[in-house]
């Protein structure tokens, strides 16, 4: 138990209807600018749920097992992720691919190159292409943006780009 409050002050942005890439990029830029306004050292981590879902599809992960695997990814618990993957019928090579997501984290360009090389299907390639397009926008903006493909949102809710920000001195994402 964390002994922290159950309520969390947070801010979000939701886009309804057809969402174009430019709108997504603007949302990421807004997050960057918001963190920069706080004046402390900051990091913005970016991921794409399409990459995770594409890997699940490629490995034949049953729908019922996916929320549990996402939970283990969020916890960054390689041992339990492997165990849950094997319990879901994923072979050793597939479990290696899932735990490998935990290593797809770091500088945006280097991590994206590794992610592109690991794509197994069109869904993963499409997510990587969207992250590549976003990289061009981020280069122009500067800032401390990292790619972390183990960053996973709630399965029922998030389906595309996800991101969260950190400030120096705070133990949790904003």
Feature map (PLM): residue ranges:
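Short, solvent-exposed helix-helix connector turns and helix-capping sites enriched
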Residues: 48, 76-77, 107
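Positively charged, Gly/Ser-enriched RNA/tRNA-binding surfaces
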Residues: 1-41, 84-174
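Hydrophobic mid-domain F-helix/FG-region of cytochrome P450s
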Residues: 32-36, 50-60
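Short, conserved phosphate-binding/catalytic loop or strand-edge motifs used
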Residues: 7-11, 46-54
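A generic structural motif
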Residues: 42-47, 68-72, 148-149
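Acidic, His- and aromatic-enriched active-site or binding-groove loops in soluble protein domains
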Residues: 61-86, 90, 167-170
């Amino acid at each position: 138990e964390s002994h922290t409050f159950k309520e969390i002050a947070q801010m979000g942005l939701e886009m309804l209807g057809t969402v174009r890439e430019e709108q997504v990029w603007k949302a990421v830029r807004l997050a960057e600018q918001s963190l920069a306004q706080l004046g402390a050292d900051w990091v913005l981590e970016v991921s794409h749920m399409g990459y995770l879902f594409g890997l699940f599809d490629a490995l034949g992960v049953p729908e019922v097992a996916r929320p549990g695997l996402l939970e283990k990814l969020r916890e960054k618990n390689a041992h339990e992720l492997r165990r849950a993957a094997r319990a879901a019928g994923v072979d050793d090579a597939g479990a290696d691919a899932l735990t490998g997501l935990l290593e797809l984290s770091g500088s945006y360009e280097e991590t994206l190159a590794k992610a592109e090389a690991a794509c197994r299907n069109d869904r993963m390639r499409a997510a990587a292409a969207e992250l590549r397009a976003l990289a061009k926008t981020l280069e122009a903006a500067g800032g401390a943006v990292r790619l972390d493909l183990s960053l996973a949102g709630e399965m029922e809710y998030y389906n595309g780009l996800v991101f969260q920000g950190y400030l120096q001195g705070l133990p949790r994402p904003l």
